[in-house]
Amino acid sequence: MSNETKQPEQGEEYLVPVERYMAAAVRLGARVSNNYLQERGFIFSVRPDGLRIFNLKRIDERIRIAARMITRYPPSRVMVHSTKPYAFKPIQMFCKFVGCLPVTGRLIPGTLTNPYLTHHIDIDLLMVADPKTDFQAINEASLTGIPVIALVDTDSDPTFIDLMIPCNNKGRNSLALVFWLLARQVLRERGELKPNEDLPVSWEEFRVPVGQSRS
Protein backbone atom coordinates (compact mmCIF):
# COMPACT_ATOMS: atom_id res chain seq x y z
CA MET A 1 0.00 0.00 0.00
CA SER A 2 0.97 3.66 -0.25
CA ASN A 3 3.44 5.16 2.16
CA GLU A 4 1.57 6.57 5.16
CA THR A 5 3.26 9.97 4.90
CA LYS A 6 1.79 10.64 1.45
CA GLN A 7 -1.86 10.75 2.41
CA PRO A 8 -2.62 14.41 3.29
CA GLU A 9 -3.03 16.53 0.18
CA GLN A 10 -1.50 19.98 -0.07
CA GLY A 11 -3.96 22.64 1.05
CA GLU A 12 -6.57 20.15 2.23
CA GLU A 13 -8.47 21.51 5.21
CA TYR A 14 -8.79 19.42 8.35
CA LEU A 15 -10.27 20.22 11.74
CA VAL A 16 -6.71 20.53 13.06
CA PRO A 17 -3.35 20.55 11.28
CA VAL A 18 -2.30 17.14 10.01
CA GLU A 19 0.77 17.32 12.23
CA ARG A 20 -1.40 17.44 15.33
CA TYR A 21 -3.33 14.34 14.28
CA MET A 22 -0.03 12.56 13.69
CA ALA A 23 1.59 13.71 16.94
CA ALA A 24 -1.39 12.36 18.89
CA ALA A 25 -1.17 9.04 16.99
CA VAL A 26 -4.84 9.30 16.02
CA ARG A 27 -4.21 7.35 12.80
CA LEU A 28 -2.50 4.35 14.38
CA GLY A 29 -4.60 1.20 14.29
CA ALA A 30 -4.01 -2.38 15.33
CA ARG A 31 -2.12 -5.15 13.55
CA VAL A 32 -5.42 -6.79 12.72
CA SER A 33 -8.21 -5.36 10.60
CA ASN A 34 -11.58 -6.54 9.37
CA ASN A 35 -12.91 -6.43 5.83
CA TYR A 36 -15.81 -4.17 6.83
CA LEU A 37 -13.50 -1.27 7.65
CA GLN A 38 -11.17 -1.99 4.74
CA GLU A 39 -14.00 -2.01 2.19
CA ARG A 40 -15.27 1.36 3.42
CA GLY A 41 -11.95 3.07 2.94
CA PHE A 42 -11.19 3.54 6.63
CA ILE A 43 -7.75 1.92 6.39
CA PHE A 44 -5.16 3.79 4.35
CA SER A 45 -2.01 1.69 4.60
CA VAL A 46 -0.03 -0.90 6.55
CA ARG A 47 3.33 -0.06 8.13
CA PRO A 48 6.30 -2.44 7.84
CA ASP A 49 5.70 -3.48 11.47
CA GLY A 50 2.14 -4.52 10.59
CA LEU A 51 0.24 -1.65 12.20
CA ARG A 52 -2.71 -0.43 10.15
CA ILE A 53 -2.90 3.29 9.40
CA PHE A 54 -6.31 4.92 9.28
CA ASN A 55 -7.42 7.17 6.45
CA LEU A 56 -7.05 10.62 7.99
CA LYS A 57 -9.67 12.16 5.73
CA ARG A 58 -12.24 9.62 6.90
CA ILE A 59 -11.42 10.32 10.55
CA ASP A 60 -11.94 14.03 10.00
CA GLU A 61 -15.19 13.49 8.07
CA ARG A 62 -16.62 11.15 10.70
CA ILE A 63 -15.91 13.57 13.54
CA ARG A 64 -17.90 16.21 11.67
CA ILE A 65 -20.76 13.80 10.95
CA ALA A 66 -20.85 12.58 14.56
CA ALA A 67 -21.01 16.16 15.82
CA ARG A 68 -24.00 16.88 13.58
CA MET A 69 -25.69 13.70 14.76
CA ILE A 70 -25.17 14.60 18.42
CA THR A 71 -26.70 18.05 17.92
CA ARG A 72 -29.98 16.45 16.81
CA TYR A 73 -30.64 15.28 20.36
CA PRO A 74 -31.11 17.14 23.65
CA PRO A 75 -27.73 16.96 25.43
CA SER A 76 -29.27 15.38 28.53
CA ARG A 77 -30.54 12.51 26.35
CA VAL A 78 -27.07 11.62 25.05
CA MET A 79 -25.00 9.20 27.13
CA VAL A 80 -21.24 8.93 26.62
CA HIS A 81 -19.76 5.76 28.07
CA SER A 82 -16.59 3.75 28.43
CA THR A 83 -15.03 1.25 30.77
CA LYS A 84 -11.51 2.29 29.62
CA PRO A 85 -9.70 4.46 32.20
CA TYR A 86 -7.90 6.35 29.41
CA ALA A 87 -11.32 7.49 28.17
CA PHE A 88 -12.67 8.67 31.53
CA LYS A 89 -11.28 12.20 31.53
CA PRO A 90 -11.89 12.80 27.80
CA ILE A 91 -15.52 11.76 28.28
CA GLN A 92 -15.99 13.85 31.40
CA MET A 93 -14.49 16.92 29.73
CA PHE A 94 -16.55 16.39 26.58
CA CYS A 95 -19.74 16.18 28.63
CA LYS A 96 -18.75 19.22 30.68
CA PHE A 97 -18.67 21.38 27.56
CA VAL A 98 -21.45 19.72 25.57
CA GLY A 99 -23.87 18.90 28.41
CA CYS A 100 -24.19 15.17 27.72
CA LEU A 101 -24.39 12.44 30.37
CA PRO A 102 -21.02 10.86 31.27
CA VAL A 103 -21.13 7.25 32.45
CA THR A 104 -17.66 5.82 33.03
CA GLY A 105 -16.64 2.50 34.51
CA ARG A 106 -18.61 -0.72 34.59
CA LEU A 107 -22.18 -0.45 33.31
CA ILE A 108 -24.65 -2.22 35.59
CA PRO A 109 -26.69 -4.70 33.53
CA GLY A 110 -30.16 -3.38 32.77
CA THR A 111 -29.14 0.27 32.92
CA LEU A 112 -30.62 0.95 29.48
CA THR A 113 -33.12 -1.90 29.23
CA ASN A 114 -34.93 -2.24 32.57
CA PRO A 115 -37.05 0.82 33.51
CA TYR A 116 -37.87 -0.74 36.89
CA LEU A 117 -34.30 -0.52 38.14
CA THR A 118 -33.31 2.47 40.26
CA HIS A 119 -30.19 2.98 38.15
CA HIS A 120 -32.09 2.90 34.84
CA ILE A 121 -31.14 5.64 32.38
CA ASP A 122 -33.50 6.72 29.61
CA ILE A 123 -31.56 8.10 26.63
CA ASP A 124 -31.92 8.74 22.90
CA LEU A 125 -28.30 8.34 21.78
CA LEU A 126 -25.27 6.40 23.02
CA MET A 127 -21.62 7.10 22.27
CA VAL A 128 -18.86 4.72 23.37
CA ALA A 129 -15.07 4.83 23.20
CA ASP A 130 -14.43 1.18 22.32
CA PRO A 131 -16.87 -1.50 21.09
CA LYS A 132 -14.60 -4.22 22.48
CA THR A 133 -14.76 -3.03 26.10
CA ASP A 134 -18.12 -1.24 25.98
CA PHE A 135 -20.12 -4.10 24.48
CA GLN A 136 -22.60 -4.22 27.39
CA ALA A 137 -23.86 -0.73 26.63
CA ILE A 138 -23.94 -1.41 22.88
CA ASN A 139 -25.94 -4.60 23.35
CA GLU A 140 -28.46 -2.88 25.61
CA ALA A 141 -28.80 0.01 23.17
CA SER A 142 -29.50 -2.43 20.35
CA LEU A 143 -32.29 -4.06 22.37
CA THR A 144 -34.01 -0.73 22.97
CA GLY A 145 -33.50 0.84 19.54
CA ILE A 146 -30.99 3.46 20.71
CA PRO A 147 -28.56 4.53 17.96
CA VAL A 148 -24.87 4.13 18.73
CA ILE A 149 -21.82 6.20 17.83
CA ALA A 150 -18.51 4.44 18.49
CA LEU A 151 -14.82 5.16 18.22
CA VAL A 152 -13.52 2.11 16.35
CA ASP A 153 -10.08 0.61 15.90
CA THR A 154 -9.11 -1.45 12.85
CA ASP A 155 -10.08 -4.67 14.63
CA SER A 156 -13.40 -3.44 16.10
CA ASP A 157 -16.64 -5.34 15.57
CA PRO A 158 -19.13 -3.01 13.78
CA THR A 159 -22.20 -4.95 14.93
CA PHE A 160 -24.98 -2.68 16.28
CA ILE A 161 -22.97 0.49 15.59
CA ASP A 162 -24.80 3.16 13.61
CA LEU A 163 -21.92 5.59 13.13
CA MET A 164 -18.26 4.68 13.38
CA ILE A 165 -15.45 7.14 14.03
CA PRO A 166 -12.24 5.38 12.91
CA CYS A 167 -9.32 6.27 15.16
CA ASN A 168 -6.81 5.03 17.69
CA ASN A 169 -9.19 4.42 20.60
CA LYS A 170 -6.51 3.11 22.96
CA GLY A 171 -3.99 5.94 23.36
CA ARG A 172 -4.39 8.73 25.90
CA ASN A 173 -3.33 11.41 23.42
CA SER A 174 -5.58 10.16 20.66
CA LEU A 175 -8.65 9.85 22.88
CA ALA A 176 -8.06 13.33 24.27
CA LEU A 177 -7.75 14.94 20.85
CA VAL A 178 -10.74 13.13 19.34
CA PHE A 179 -13.07 14.03 22.21
CA TRP A 180 -11.76 17.62 22.20
CA LEU A 181 -12.48 17.87 18.48
CA LEU A 182 -15.94 16.38 18.96
CA ALA A 183 -16.75 18.85 21.73
CA ARG A 184 -15.54 21.80 19.69
CA GLN A 185 -17.40 20.67 16.59
CA VAL A 186 -20.67 20.09 18.47
CA LEU A 187 -20.51 23.61 19.89
CA ARG A 188 -19.74 25.01 16.45
CA GLU A 189 -22.71 23.13 14.99
CA ARG A 190 -24.94 24.57 17.71
CA GLY A 191 -23.66 28.06 17.04
CA GLU A 192 -22.22 28.34 20.53
CA LEU A 193 -18.76 28.71 19.00
CA LYS A 194 -17.93 30.60 15.83
CA PRO A 195 -16.82 28.48 12.84
CA ASN A 196 -13.13 29.09 13.58
CA GLU A 197 -13.39 29.49 17.35
CA ASP A 198 -11.71 27.06 19.74
CA LEU A 199 -12.70 25.71 23.12
CA PRO A 200 -11.40 27.77 26.06
CA VAL A 201 -9.07 24.88 26.98
CA SER A 202 -6.47 23.03 24.94
CA TRP A 203 -6.88 19.42 23.87
CA GLU A 204 -4.23 18.47 26.42
CA GLU A 205 -6.72 19.36 29.16
CA PHE A 206 -8.81 16.39 27.98
CA ARG A 207 -5.91 14.00 28.51
CA VAL A 208 -5.58 11.51 31.35
CA PRO A 209 -2.49 12.26 33.48
CA VAL A 210 0.60 10.16 32.91
CA GLY A 211 0.66 7.06 35.09
CA GLN A 212 -3.06 6.35 35.14
CA SER A 213 -3.93 2.77 34.21
CA ARG A 214 -4.74 2.15 30.56
CA SER A 215 -6.40 -1.23 31.12
UniProtKB/Swiss-Prot annotation:
<dbReference type="InterPro" id="IPR023454">
    <property type="entry name" value="Ribosomal_uS2_arc"/>
</dbReference>
<dbReference type="InterPro" id="IPR023591">
    <property type="entry name" value="Ribosomal_uS2_flav_dom_sf"/>
</dbReference>
<dbReference type="InterPro" id="IPR001865">
    <property type="entry name" value="Ribosomal_uS2"/>
</dbReference>
<comment type="similarity">
    <text>Belongs to the universal ribosomal protein uS2 family.</text>
</comment>
<dbReference type="InterPro" id="IPR005707">
    <property type="entry name" value="Ribosomal_uS2_euk/arc"/>
</dbReference>
<dbReference type="GO" id="GO:0006412">
    <property type="term" value="P:translation"/>
</dbReference>
<dbReference type="GO" id="GO:0003735">
    <property type="term" value="F:structural constituent of ribosome"/>
</dbReference>
<keyword id="KW-0687">Ribonucleoprotein</keyword>
<protein>
    <recommendedName>
        <fullName>Small ribosomal subunit protein uS2</fullName>
    </recommendedName>
</protein>
<keyword id="KW-0689">Ribosomal protein</keyword>
<dbReference type="Pfam" id="PF00318">
    <property type="entry name" value="Ribosomal_S2"/>
</dbReference>
<dbReference type="GO" id="GO:0015935">
    <property type="term" value="C:small ribosomal subunit"/>
</dbReference>
